[in-house]
Amino acid sequence: MNALHQKCAVCGRFTTEFNYSVLSCNSCKIFFRRLIVRTVPIKKCFRGERCFEKTPYIFKCTSCRFQKCLYVGMTLPSYLLVLEQNKEQRLAITIDCVRNTHNKRMDSLFNFFVTEMNPNVDDIVELNKITYTKRDEHIRMDFQTWAFHSCVTTIDFMKQFPFVNLLRSTDQMILLKESYVKLGALISATRAYSSKKQCISFPDGTDCLPKTQWTVPKISPNLENRIRCRVIDKLRELNIQNDEFYLLSVLLFCNPAITNLSENGQLLLTSYQKMYSSALLYYCLLTYQKSGPSRFSELLGLFTLLGQHYDDIIHYYVLMQLNQSEVELKKLVKDGIEAAYKS
């Protein structure tokens, strides 16, 4: 076919350009480039997500147009990836971006609180912006309040990354539900490790497990100690560095293998997983030289331990229910735990 008669794979306009691995017009190239770096959620499609299935396409639907970009095979541009020609600069930018986002989460966790009374995960995820209120020193924070606030700030942290906001609403919900308890555990354990503490706790020292009403313990102390200490012990064994933690924290939830994701959701997460994993690998090669590949594997092995930690939390939660504990968890905390056996 004559080049003049070829059509953009996304919108069908005539074009001779090839952008992001796909035959695509200049308009769709600019559209894709703008979206892959935005941190503001895309407006949901209210037409059943079929605006680009057949002509005439509805170009005003940002969500469907972006999904079509993914479907036809558009890939992340080289300037977002840690490649041979831009390695050190791109690595520094990537780490700085994650570090700054973590610092914002820490400020929200330590100095603010959320006024919503008892929302569930759907309520929090659907908020375009979470509103925080400055916390006075006299405000009392107990286990229930800290656990809830930690979950809110963790979800908010995840939603600051472009790939989360680019997912379809159903995929976004699946990703966040599957990940925020594990990510919160990694962040809390790293904070404890950096502070040279032996156990996971909340910022004011409140235990990460609730106080129960039982005079005689009904849950194994070994299980409780695993929840409090095992992840920190592994971090200490690895002697994990801050930059490694930053990259791992994003890789933890940038996971295309999560069950029930759509094909487009898997494609998007695969692209960003490649971006962050290549950054971590290059960091390891730069820092540890010949030992870089083995260090990279050791760090990724932490995800297996976090899965076991999550299983322990679920086990603990089930035992609390079986033993009729009087501890009442907030909906958001329960949703994160119950996601494992409701998906």
Curated annotation (Swiss-Prot):
DNA repair as UniProt keyword: no
Residues in the signal sequence: none
SMART domains: HOLI, ZnF_C4
GO molecular function: DNA-binding transcription factor activity; sequence-specific DNA binding; zinc ion binding
SUPFAM superfamilies per the UniProt record, alphabetical: Glucocorticoid receptor-like (DNA-binding domain), Nuclear receptor ligand-binding domain
Annotated ranges, domain NR LBD: 101-339
One family name in Pfam for this protein: Hormone_recep
Location, primary (coarse class): nucleus
Family: Belongs to the nuclear hormone receptor family.
Protein name: Nuclear hormone receptor family member nhr-167
Organism: Caenorhabditis elegans
